[in-house]
Amino acid sequence: MEVDLNDRNSGIGGSDCYTLIHGTKKDWNKLWEIKTGRTEPPCLSDKFNVQLGIITEQFNLHCLTQKLLSSHKNTNKGMPIETSRQIKTGDIYDNKYIKINEGGTTIKSNLLKLQGHLDGAIYNGNDSEDMCCIIECKHTYQDNTLANLIQSYNPQMQHYMNVFNQDHAIMSGIFGNKCHMFQVVKRDHEFIHRLEAFQRFFWRSVVADKPPFDIDDD
């Protein structure tokens, strides 16, 4: 599917879902200002932690690949790639459209675009259409835990599983300069249903050109 990477304000992406689940009312309103063109999205080119994650992404995927190549289930955690599967990275994009008002029609004005851009994915064989697992890479601080990393970015992973119609995602994390760990995360239908409700509520405010919440600027 053709995706305009310069048109992120035309829908909701994975990073937006972090705000929708973990953010405050002020965070929602700030996101609304970006989506409606009132403010520019933050520039991440000088954010050290963001750029470090980008630079170490390939090494992150290398560490993950070595573990998934293992024949031991305790190491590959039930997601072996061996010779029948392969990891791909780069230019993995897709969109999914849902109704803004569930009881409404499917005309363009009632459609919300959910956007997905993956760090990587596992495919069956050489078939670029046969995806079987999403990969999300993060470089976090040394004393963080894998459980906390998954909890923080679960909205993003569940969003991607929804967009790409997948049942599994891998959180692949580098912890400071100490170690690499990963975990397979299953699709959570109840969570996705709740997330879509938040996405619809938020996007209705974008369409109406009215902030999601009336709050004092204190």
Range-by-range predicted roles:
Residues 68, 72-207:
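Nucleic-acid nuclease catalytic cores
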